[in-house]
Each structure stands twice: as C-alpha cells, then as structure tokens.
Amino acid sequence: TDITDINLRLDETNDALSRIFQKGTVDFSQTKDIRASVARLKVGSSLNISELLNISAILSCEKHVKDYYEHREDSISGMLENLATVDTLNSQIKKCIISEDEISDDASSNLRSIRRSKSIANDRIHSELNKLLNSPTYRTYLQDYVITTRQGRYCLPVKAEYKSAFPGMIHDQSSTGSTLFIEPAAVVKLNNDIRELELKEAAEIEVILADLSVKAGEHTEELLCNYEILVELDCIFAKAQLARHMHASRPVMNTSGIINIKKGRHPLIEPHTVVPIDIYLGTDFKLLIITGPNTGGKTVSLKTVGLLTLMAQSGLFIPA
C-alpha cells in the first residue's frame, strides 16, 4: 500500500511495455527453479542431468535477455545489468549433456572410448546371433527369427520343446509358455563384456556429472542471483503483456482516498460483453450508494472498483 513502492512497480510495468513495443517479448518459460539444486551445490553434492540442464537453461535465458534488450536507463535496467554472465559453465554443460536421456560422447575421452568398445562388442554379438539365426541346425528350434533382449542380455526366442537341444541360459518365457528366451552359450562372454562396459559407462557419466557439479558450485551466488532476477523480470514482463492484451492504462495513484475511474472494465468479463463504468468518489463526497434492479450491474460495479484498485496496488495497468 506504500505509494512509492506502487509507483515503482508501475514504472517497471511501463518500461517493460515500452521494451515490448520496441523489440517484442522474451520467453522466460525456461526459467527453472534451481534453488534446491544450488543448496545441494553449496554442501558439495553432485547434481543429476536434469538439474544441470536447469542451470544451463537459467544461464541461456540470462544471456538471451541481456542480448535482446539493449542498454537503456529505466526502472528495470539495473536488474538487467545485475544479471551475471557465466558463459564458460553454460558451454561446458551444453558440450557434455545433449538431453535428459543422453550424455555426449564429447563429454570425456574416456566415455568416448568406452562407447566405442561397447559399439564394437554389440556388433560382434549381433554377428554371432545372426549366424545362429541363419544356421540350418538352429533355425528349426527358433519360434521367430529375431534378436531380442531380456534382463539386459541378448537372447533368441526358442520353442519350449527344443530347450534341451539349444545350449544356453534361459532368461524368460512367453505368457503361454510356448517360447523361451535363451541366451546362447556362444554369446555369454560377449554379453558379459557389454554389461561390464555399461557399468563403466555409468561410472564415467557419474564422474562427468560430479565434475560439472564442482564447476557449477563455484558460481552458486551468481546462479541464485540470476534466478531471482529472472523470476522478477518474468513477473514484470507478464504484467506488461497483460496490459498490452487488455489495452490497459497506467493508473495515477494518490494518497487522498480519491477514486476517479473512467470507462473502467471488469478485467474478468469478456471484452465484447463488458459494460464500461465511470466511478467517482472521495472529493465532493466520500460515500456512494449504488441502486437499481437485479442484474443491473451493482455487484459488477463494486467488484470492478475493488479489482482495479488491487491491480493498481500490484503494479498492474488497469482496463480503463
């Protein structure tokens, strides 16, 4: 209710609206809540892929906002100037993490080597399994000529009646019991090799995430500051967008208890059906009685005054 604070909020909305008219708006939707992640970084914990991507999103949004709105002196220029640039960290995260489900081969030379070995092992095991699929001896035993996986192991679908004739380890069976999924003895070692490489890959990914977390931990204050500023800017520009959408005007505030609304429109009623009203109160008289028949607009008028007053106190422009 402090008029100085209200006018500052209205200035911010006005300046954001001016920037929107000049250059359009910025998408703040990638501003993720990183406060819990920053708290974990402060105690030396490692972040997961999703948390690191959220940090990258904050840094990308910061850069986009600063690049998009050129320097100009107004009520929000200070916030824009206080956004901290941490490009190196953002570049490192983007280099290592492709998506929430994938770490880049470029994240480390060790990871690239492990994945290359894993690819070679996969090619070898598929080659061995294809030999069995095309073998006249084993084709009779197979329910279908496909390679499948069960419990992370490559298997072949074998007819249940031939399980004794097909050397290997049973991992699963079909719902009817007519098909057994058997890991052929010839590929057990290759399956073991792949599993070992998968464990090495997972361990290397943990090392990469831990390293990125250490680097992010060096910028906890900047990250938290950027998050708080971007949230504030998001709110300010949302107010400006609403003002633009409603064709709203900046209210002139006073401390004298005077209300003088001209062609005020209830903000929640459809624009093509709302009936504008004029309300004047506080100078010649301080009490206003509204009378009229049912559905004549008495309640809507009272609510319009209340809502427009609250909007103005919140730094919003009003539809009037």
Where are these regions (language model features)?
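Short, Lys/Arg-rich amphipathic alpha-helical interaction segments
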Residues: E70-A84, T88
